[in-house]
Amino acid sequence: ANVKFKYLNPTDLAQAMATKLIDAMVGSEPWAINTENLCGASVHELGNSSGLGSTFPIVIVASEKALKEKGEALERFLAALDRANEYILSDWDDAMAICASHTGLSVEDQSKGSGLQFFELGFNETDVQSIAMTAMYLLDLEKIEAVSVIMDHVDLRFLPGE
């Protein structure tokens, strides 16, 4: 079979499926729920990564130059993310209403999709294991030649409370 991969803005995924511009989509929440809601019974979730035992952390990457020249701005950015996470956890319903106003989902669906995620700032042993697990999979597929020691490439200095 001939498969063509096409990058789309996540906000366009549901409409692309509904208009048959694409035959399948891969995306994180809330875009999967949004697609299921718009397309109804014409689409089917074939699988998701929720049972893999991985946190799939979102990693922030910065150059040495950026760390030296804009370290304070990075610290402020991370502090803002930390405050946002605290707000989400302390006032879930209001936070989901705010998110839903930007994603186009109902508050209920936004809450469902967001409920699959962790809202914390940090990097712990579970995250290291998650990245290592993904790296081992890529190694098995021969997409990479070796697995690095993850913590050799992680700098925790800029995290709040570190």
Language model features with spans:
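A local structural motif
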Residues: A1-N9, T19-D23, V107, I144-I150
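Short secondary-structure boundary/hinge segments and terminal tails
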Residues: T35, G53-T55, Q117-F118, I150, ...
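Short, solvent-exposed polar/charged micro-motifs at secondary-structure junctions
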Residues: Q15-M17, P57, L121, R157-E162
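Conserved C-terminal helix/tail region of periplasmic/extracytoplasmic solute-binding proteins
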Residues: L138-E162
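Pocket-lining segment of extracytoplasmic ligand-binding domains
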Residues: T11-S101
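Solvent-exposed, flexible loop/coil residues
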Residues: D12, G71, F123-D127, S148, ...
